[in-house]
Regions:
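Nucleotide/phosphate-binding catalytic cleft detector across ATP-hydrolyzing
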Residues: 1-51, 61-175, 182-208, 214-219
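Short beta-strand motif preference
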Residues: 56-58
């Protein structure tokens, strides 16, 4: 078998070699890498924000030129970590990262419909005993707000470096937001508010990269 792996544009050669060896150790005969920019880039001018679990990438391309290509290791994982802290401060119970991610998804769904829903999960006390937890979705909003606002500030900074003609183009045609954070209420709203432009969100979250890769042929 062979694999084609989409990676952050700034992934070092050493990191690629480590990943390649890991795949080879699993029996994969051929490993190729392609950057997220290469997968998602379009012929027309494009402003891409790809924010998943581990990192956020910002790419701005036009006229066969890359104006911005930035990778920041700050994304959904930081939301989950903040939710863990918030829940512990409110209840005294520790929840797993999986449960934190679930709360993020459920809270985000509630925010989209302007609701303050009651969320449920389980947490561990200091003796590792499991307890049911009920919290309102508004309790986890500060975690989503913190990360979303920071991502939007980076996007705004990149936007401000562009020539006026490109700024006008993206104000009209919008910014594309993909990755798992595109499913989350917050990033698109903050970006749209800061730049006053449309934000075109993927409808399938983390699966959009997989779909894009299906059309890529290996060398």
């Amino acid at each position: 078998p062979s694999v084609l792996v989409s990676v952050p544009s700034e992934l070092s050669q050493r990191q690629r070699e480590l990943w390649q060896q890991a795949f080879l150790n699993c029996g994969v005969r051929k490993v190729e890498f392609i950057s997220n920019l290469e997968v998602l880039q379009e012929e027309n001018p494009c402003f891409l924000v790809h924010s998943g679990h581990s990192y956020t990438e910002i790419h701005i391309c036009a006229y066969d030129k890359v104006f911005v290509s930035k990778t920041i290791y700050y994304a959904g994982a930081q939301v989950d970590e903040q939710i863990q802290r918030i829940v512990y401060m409110k209840t005294g119970y520790f929840i797993t990262k999986v449960d934190a991610a679930h709360l993020k998804e459920m809270a985000s769904h509630a925010f989209k419909y302007k609701k303050n829903s009651l969320l449920m999960c389980y947490g561990f006390d200091s003796r590792q005993n499991l307890h049911p937890i009920q919290i309102e979705s508004s309790i986890v909003w500060p975690a989503i707000e913190m990360v979303s606002s920071q991502i939007s500030l980076w996007v705004k900074h990149c936007f401000d470096t562009l020539p006026a003609s490109l700024q006008e183009y993206f104000l009209m045609h919008g910014i594309e937001l993909s990755g798992g954070m595109a499913d989350c209420f917050g990033p698109s709203q903050f970006i749209s508010q800061n730049i006053s432009c449309p934000v075109l969100c993927t409808k399938r979250g983390q699966y959009d990269m997989i779909d894009a890769l299906k059309g890529v042929k290996s060398a």
